[in-house]
C-alpha cells in the first residue's frame, strides 16, 4: 500500500490518472483481498477505503483508511505478487484502476516517472522499517545493522 505516498508527487498521480479506468464501489464492496494476485493499482479518487490485514489466528490489524489521493497496491503490482492487505469501500468510492501490464509498460517508457515510483517505494520501506523497530522496541542508530533477535528492554 502506498498511502502517504498519496501526497503523491503530482507528476506521478497526473501521469497515471489518464491510464486508469474509473470504477465505482458501494459501501462494503471489496476492492481486493489479501492473498489475491495483484493485477494492478488503485488510485482512490473519491470516498474512503478501509485497509486491513489478517494475522494468523484470524486477528485483524486495521491500517489507516485510504482517502482520496491514495494509491493502493503499487509494490504488489510492480512485483507481480499477491496483496499483503485487503481493501473495502466504507462509503461510496471511486477508484481509478491501472492494470499491472499497463503500469509496467508506462514505467518502461517514462523513466522519470519510474524514478518517482522507486523513490516512493523506498520511502514506504523506510517508514515500515521504523514502524517495525518501534514495535520491536529495538530501534537502532542510523548506520548500524538491526539485530532482530535482540529482546526489547
Locate the predicted segments by residue.
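Cytosolic regulatory regions built on CNB/CRP/Popeye-like sensor folds
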Residues: 1-153
Amino acid at each position: 500500500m502506498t498511502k502517504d505516498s498519496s501526497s503523491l508527487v503530482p507528476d506521478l498521480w497526473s501521469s497515471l490518472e489518464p491510464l486508469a479506468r474509473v470504477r465505482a464501489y458501494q459501501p462494503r464492496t471489496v476492492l481486493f483481498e489479501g492473498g489475491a494476485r495483484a493485477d494492478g493499482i488503485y488510485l482512490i479518487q473519491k470516498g474512503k477505503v478501509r485497509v486491513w490485514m489478517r494475522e494468523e489466528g484470524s486477528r485483524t490489524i486495521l491500517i489507516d483508511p485510504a482517502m482520496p489521493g491514495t494509491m493502493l497496491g503499487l509494490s504488489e503490482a510492480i512485483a507481480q505478487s499477491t496483496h499483503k492487505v485487503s481493501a473495502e469501500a466504507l462509503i461510496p468510492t471511486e477508484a481509478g484502476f491501472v492494470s499491472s501490464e499497463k503500469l509496467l509498460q508506462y514505467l518502461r517508457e517514462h523513466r522519470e516517472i519510474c524514478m518517482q515510483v522507486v523513490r516512493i517505494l523506498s520511502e514506504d520501506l523506510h517508514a515500515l522499517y521504523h514502524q517495525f523497530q518501534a514495535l520491536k522496541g529495538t530501534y537502532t542508530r542510523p548506520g548500524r545493522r538491526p539485530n532482530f533477535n535482540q529482546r526489547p528492554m
